[in-house]
Amino acid sequence: MAKQGRARVLTEQEHQKMLTFLAQTAYPERNLALYLIGYRTGMRVASIAGLQLSDVFDQSGKLKEVVNLSKSIVKGGKNYAVYLTHEEVREAIYNYVSIRPNRASKSALFLNNRGEPFSANSLSQLFLKLFRRAGFEGASSHSNRRSFATRAIQKGVDIVAVKTLMNHSNISTTAIYCEHNEEFLKKAVSSI
């Protein structure tokens, strides 16, 4: 359970429920791509909102595996890399872009219902609305980021690697994101 004030961490079952829910929304391709890029990469909502088509696609139209985010869209003002290597994310982005209007390379990757780029705030509000409609009280745009960090640690990814993937300056910040349930802690003790 999330501590007071912390965004809810989604379980694998909740993730599957969210995928099913998003597939039935008014903008399923866009909403799935938005959700999955956050859930599978741990990107902050402001960075997702700031993505341009040219950030994620090369000149030949191929989706990049490594996206180097510029400091202009990154908290802390330092460049960092995001890895778009998860097949689920890649498929969702391709599906969205195939139906997305305005494919000029200098335009925002994600557009709202009016065909305009999302602001960080409007994208946060969309995530909040989608999570609530899916029945996940306490979930917000930050739930994807916390879920990513928690899942990575629980699957055995070294916390230093998670720190790098999350673009944290301090490892203690990364530790705050990770939520450990009793089953995980039992397995941890048993493995020592």
Question: How does the language model describe each region?
Answer:
Residues L69-K75, I171-S191:
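Catalytic-site neighborhood detector that most strongly recognizes the C-terminal catalytic loop/helix
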Residues S47-A49, A139, A149, V157-N167:
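Active-site-proximal segment of tyrosine recombinases
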Residues G50-F57, K163-S169, C178-E179:
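A short, basic/aromatic helix-end/turn motif that makes direct DNA contacts
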Residues E12-T41, V45:
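Basic, Lys/Arg- and aromatic-enriched nucleic-acid-binding interface segment
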Residues N31, E137-K155:
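Short basic/aromatic active-site micro-motif
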Residues V74-Y94, K106-L128:
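C-terminal catalytic core of Y-nucleophile DNA break-rejoin enzymes
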Residues M1-Q16, G76-H86, R103-S105:
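DNA breakage-rejoining catalytic core of tyrosine-based enzymes
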Residues G50-N79, Y83, E88:
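Conserved tyrosine-mediated DNA breakage-rejoining catalytic core shared by Y-recombinases
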